[in-house]
Curated annotation (Swiss-Prot):
Gene that encodes the chain: ERG13
Biological source species: Zymoseptoria tritici (strain CBS 115943 / IPO323) (Speckled leaf blotch fungus)
Domain of life where this protein originates: Eukaryota
Active site: 86, 120, 262
Annotated family: Belongs to the thiolase-like superfamily. HMG-CoA synthase family.
Catalysed reactions, as listed in the record: acetoacetyl-CoA + acetyl-CoA + H2O = (3S)-3-hydroxy-3-methylglutaryl-CoA + CoA + H(+)
Entry-linked SUPFAM superfamilies: Thiolase-like
Protein name: Hydroxymethylglutaryl-CoA synthase MYCGRDRAFT_54740
């Protein structure tokens, strides 16, 4: 058995987003809504999308092959591969099995893991499963890859501008620069019909928008409470020498130097960060930090607090400076690409890595909040214990975002229609152009009369 691993975490990370996007300000005009509804009200700038040439198999194949290539990873060195997605093409065959095409040529078929599904939470569950594997007697000494990706698409209406598409692949192993703090996380899971996909004939979800925001907010509260409780337990077990809140910090929230959130919209992220500060206020209303907070807010019922505009406005104001320093660097991809469902929170981490220099990042703690409707959620954290320079260089984020083709809303609408027509089709050839697809990207060429899908890779 391999020696027990230390400092397990993220050793490398790759992000893929389609080469085309639509401008949200143009979409506002096209949809006939007031200026700023999407750009200010939702906090969204652009939205990634794909036509019928790309699907979840092609997205994950592109992302994992790119991770292997950019970091010169030997496919034989991977002992586990797990995928988190809610974009299902098959009710039986996993996306992970499709990815085995990248490992079979070298003879590596001894790779554990399949898919894990629960709305936008699947990637986090895949990560937790992988950490558990690496800490267990089942670990054989090899690294693992966790994949999180989705195509987020809504029918015409209010929710359509909150779509997006993208995929993240992470190399997980010991002695990582981004170390997941062991044993330190809090989760909240409950039964809720806030967003679900019970209509298997449609690619579109059934959504109760306001209820889903309420569920997300409750999950923020409960995960923070559970994380704090777990931290206290670990601290007491370590005789007060671990995971404590520094006396110099104004509030418990300050123990996170940065935070990443699952980002259905960037506006919800800013509200949720402020909500954590509200939780700190309830725990210690006499703290000097909260001296301007109206006294009556501490006596609100829990239900009322979730939708109370005074609570929201007061704590967004109080959190504004902290948000700019600690969360703003993480929302570059969410605002420029939209919601990637399972990949969303890890795209936030990609943004953070790309926007904070490796030198400034050292020793910092990052809080990560993951949410999936239905619902499952967790708050966990990582510590930066090594250089992130190579990751930043390989991501080349800003240049890649800038290189995308921005299309008119009319074109985006056509692409959505193409996807709608392609859904559940067999004996089918995609209609989308391959000219817009970038080199080294997988794309769909054919679906035969037994629904078997065939792909090609765009050549350099």
């Amino acid at each position: 058995m391999a020696a027990r691993p230390n400092n397990i975490g993220i050793k490398a990370i790759e992000l893929y987003f389609p080469s085309q996007c639509v401008d949200q300000a143009e979409l506002e005009k096209f949809d006939g809504v007031s200026a700023g509804k999407y750009t200010i009200g939702l906090g969204q700038t652009r939205m990634s999308f794909c036509d019928d040439r790309e699907d979840i198999y092609s997205l994950t194949l592109t992302t994992v092959s790119s991770l292997l290539r950019k970091y010169n990873i030997d496919p034989k060195s991977i002992g586990r591969l797990e995928v988190g997605t809610e974009t299902l093409l098959d009710k039986s065959k996993s996306c992970k099995t499709v990815l085995m095409q990248l490992f079979e040529p070298c003879g590596n078929t001894n790779i554990e893991g399949v898919d894990t599904v629960n709305a936008c939470y699947g990637g986090t569950n895949a990560l937790f499963n992988t950490l558990n594997w690496m800490e267990s007697s089942a670990w054989d000494g090899r690294n693992a890859i966790v994949v999180a990706g989705d195509i987020a698409l809504y029918k015409k209406g209010n929710a359509r501008p909150t779509g997006g598409a993208g995929c993240v692949a992470m190399l997980i192993g010991p002695d990582a620069p981004l170390v997941i703090e062991p044993g330190l996380r809090g989760s909240f899971v409950k039964h809720a019909y806030d967003f679900y996909k019970a209509d298997l004939t449609s690619e579109y979800p059934l959504v109760d928008g306001q209820y889903s925001i309420k569920c997300y907010t409750e999950a923020v509260d409960k995960c923070y409470e559970a994380y704090n409780g777990r931290e206290k337990t670990l601290k007491s077990q370590a005789n007060g020498h671990s995971n404590g809140v520094d006396a110099a910090q104004e509030a418990p929230l300050d123990r996170f130097d940065y935070m990443c959130f699952h980002a259905p919209t960037c506006k919800l992220v800013s509200k949720s960060y402020a909500r954590l500060l509200y939780n700190d206020y309830l725990a210690d209303p006499t703290n000097e930090l909260f001296k301007e907070v109206p006294a009556e807010l501490k006596d609100l019922s829990y239900e009322a607090s979730i939708t109370d505009k005074t609570v929201e406005k007061t704590f967004m104001g109080l959190a504004k400076k902290r948000f700019a320093q600690r969360v703003q660097p993480s929302i570059q991809v969410p605002t420029m690409c939209g919601n990637m469902y399972c990949a969303s929170v890890y795209a936030s981490l990609v943004s953070l890595i790309s926007n904070v220099s490796s030198a400034d990042f050292q020793g910092k703690r990052v809080g990560i909040f993951s949410y999936g409707s239905g619902l499952a959620s967790s708050l966990f954290s990582l510590k930066v214990k090594g250089s992130t320079e190579e990751i930043t260089k390989n991501l080349n984020l800003q240049e890649r975002l800038d290189a995308r083709r921005v299309v008119a809303p009319e074109v985006y609408d056509e692409m959505c229609n193409l996807r709608e027509k392609a859904h559940l089709q067999k004996d089918f050839k995609p209609k989308g152009s391959v000219d817009t697809i970038l080199p080294n990207t997988y794309y769909l060429t054919n679906v035969d009369d037994m629904f078997r899908r065939e792909y090609e890779v765009k050549k350099e």
